[in-house]
Amino acid sequence: MAKRSLASLNAGDLSGKRVLVRVDFNVPLNDTGAITDDTRIRAALPTINDLIGKGAKVILSAHFGRPKGQVNDAMRLTPVAARLSELLGKPVAKTDSCIGPDAEAKVGAMANGDVVLLENVRFFAEEEKNEAGFAEKLAGLAEVYVNDAFGAAHRAHASTEGVTKFLKPSVAGFLMEKELQYLQGAVDEPKRPLAAIVGGSKVSSKIGVLDTLIDKCDKVLIGGGMIFTFYKARGLSVGKSLVEEDKLELAKELEAKAKANGVQLLLPTDVVLADNFAPDANSQTADINAIPDGWMGLDIGPDSIKVFQEALADCQTVIWNGPMGVFEFDKFATGTNSIATTLADLSGKGCCTIIGGGDSVAAVEKAGLAEKMSHISTGGGASLELLEGKVLPGVAALDAA
């Protein structure tokens, strides 16, 4: 069901109004507490700037890390407020706590167009328990709710779901709207042929998404460590590669389902092997039918890259979730980088390319190709759950369009 968006609210609706905006500012920090990647902060700027422009009082709510319901000084949002202030070119006040006297005082002192960042909502255990009393206090700071935190939309927490019971309208921000448009659109109404590339080390974490994609796609390409569970299920020798022994039957079922559905399910034909799990390991390329004992597969091989490129050539929509190998090690990054380059080229030819969150986003950014893709999802678990066809609580709670 389509959701009401911030675009439906004009300056007349928002000027002078206190607007609670749930954002995803869970950014990586280094040892000195400096932000190493501000992508998530930048991703929220269109929504924040739109609200400032419409004269709203912008109250931002976010979580950071996993403080387990207790105040943890290392997980305060102080560096985030400083970076956001630089990006907006205006001061951003930060509260000492997300509810209580300090938050009320700082919100009460706001002028139209001001921005306040509430302290980490997860300092309260009630946030993750979606406790109604806590949600009501948080909502009590505002009059309108905007959810722009797609990365947290698969959680029914107080700041993503509970507050909507006390604030109307409750609408999707621009980032949330774009995520839903691309990810839901790709699964529900794709331009075909539709291909999905699924990587990563474990079948167990991608079962739901593989199962759904085999129902929806024309082609499914599988890479990453999970391929060895499929090979072992076929009776092949995989050396000391990663295998989930308890998922062998499932791998057989997924292959059988693809065949029954007339879906092209492609696994690599060759792999790059290492003698141990290290960036400087000795390596060799082998056909999947000839993996020697004592070696482990850490990337897809050159022949597989060609096969995958040929399969993708005529596709109009491609969803990619999960790397082809251990791309963190340069020696085993070729498969992942080649797929990234292929998708960038396809984008240039009018194919809709969607990078579905998680490690594939890091891989595309590392390859310097992020700008070339149609859409890069900011969600990890949320992207997977949406692609699985699950209802996300943070989305379901918003007003209907």
UniProtKB/Swiss-Prot annotation:
The keyword ATP-binding applies. GO terms for cellular component: cytosol. Keywords: ATP-binding, Cytoplasm, Glycolysis, Kinase, Nucleotide-binding, Transferase. Pfam families: PGK. ATP binds at K206, G297, E328, G357, G358, D359, S360. It catalyses: (2R)-3-phosphoglycerate + ATP = (2R)-3-phospho-glyceroyl phosphate + ADP. One of its GO terms (molecular function) is ATP binding. Its EC number is 2.7.2.3. It is an enzyme of class 2 (transferase). Coiled coil: none annotated. It is found in: Cytoplasm. The keyword Membrane does not apply. Pathway: Carbohydrate degradation; glycolysis; pyruvate from D-glyceraldehyde 3-phosphate: step 2/5. One of its GO terms (biological process) is glycolytic process. Substrate binds at D24, F25, N26, R40, H63, F64, G65, R66, R122, R155. Monomer. PANTHER family: PHOSPHOGLYCERATE KINASE (PTHR11406), PHOSPHOGLYCERATE KINASE 1, CHLOROPLASTIC-RELATED (PTHR11406:SF23). Belongs to the phosphoglycerate kinase family. This is Phosphoglycerate kinase. It comes from Synechococcus sp. (strain CC9605).
